[in-house]
Amino acid sequence: MALDRERLMQVLDRAHSGPICEPFKWDTEVIPQTIAAALRKYDLVKTCDPANPVNQSDELADRFFQAGFDVAVEVGMLCLDTQRIIKFSREEIRYGLDAAPAEFTLGEGEEKVVFRHRGLDDPFPPVWVAPLSIAVEEPLFIPIVEGILRERVVDCLEGPSLQTIWGSKLRAGSPYELLAGKLQADLNYEAIRRAGREGIGMYAVGTAPTHYGVLGGYGIPGGYKPERDIVLLLTPVEMKTTYEVLHKLCQTYNCGGITYGGSWSMIGGYAGGPEGAAVSCIACTLLLYTAYQASNGAS
């Protein structure tokens, strides 16, 4: 699904015209107070049962979803660089969900794989992506990726990330990172060749602590391919974005690609306990599909 320019510009414009909020106030007042109010409104306080961590109550799930939806509408997404809030209406968030594809593909040839929306007890098989951009030493990169890809259960590759580039320390936001984006693509392709998995889809770019890794490795000759791969847009919690993430979004638009939106609320953080973290995760996910036009994502 190609990214829509009007929706993209809407996000960028609101990042520069929305209500002002300092990050400290966002973290210590806006987020905890709004989530706590939603928990009370939907009677979700202390509903987490440690003895039953995977609660299968449809009614409880519905209340959590409505609470998360309310939080997404009320709070929006804070752009840290401008300290302005990108707000979305309830209708805009619903449209963002409706516009997300029911299915899409990554990879090419024999390695093409279908991602499809799966409901409860859905028999359609899940897609396995491995691993999660964990930093490894440079000499170990190719052997690790090759070993992973020799396991046929792996459908797509994110791969590890790099700590160094040709022996030099990799520094975020520096020219090293721009080079590292292409180097990671090169190393992945060599490991793919050795494992006999040519055409496998990839998540781009693991070695991108800022936007430069994506600019240096995605949509360029010999780099990650927009027609086959997906761009990682990992956004800060709770419900924040940055110029770095928006640069990646714009590069994806320029190259005609698709995005994965990710953001992980943690128990005990600004969202509070397990119930608050669950509500925050739902709100974040709704905003990721709305702001980033994600084809795939989670919080």
Predicted regions and their residues:
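Glycine-rich anion/phosphate-binding loop at the beta-strand->alpha-helix junction
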Residues: 207, 217-299
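Metallocofactor- and cofactor-centric catalytic cores in central/energy metabolism, strongly enriched
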Residues: 1-220, 234-244
